[in-house]
């Protein structure tokens, strides 16, 4: 499965548009990580805990996106948009959503 934020794939021709596909992941953030991440932010450091959670959420969302595309018989997803949001009380959860168009391609 190929993923692209562009509307085309170099070297491939889109032969069929299969439909819009989406993937979402919502992960809760641990209160202690939140506290220490806040301290790191104050002193200008990076928050490894948040970065790890963000990567994990993005991977889950892309797995879901690919699964939906495969179910439609597609071999690629183009025009992908990635959105990040904090949700829940006081932004206690992280949501990553991805969407794109599932397509069938040929060389």
Curated annotation (Swiss-Prot):
Domain of life: Bacteria
InterPro entries reported for this sequence: UPF0145_dom_sf, UPF0145_YbjQ-like
NCBIfam families assigned to the protein according to its UniProt record, in alphabetical order: PRK02877.1
Similarity remark: Belongs to the UPF0145 family.
Protein name, UniProt field: UPF0145 protein YbjQ
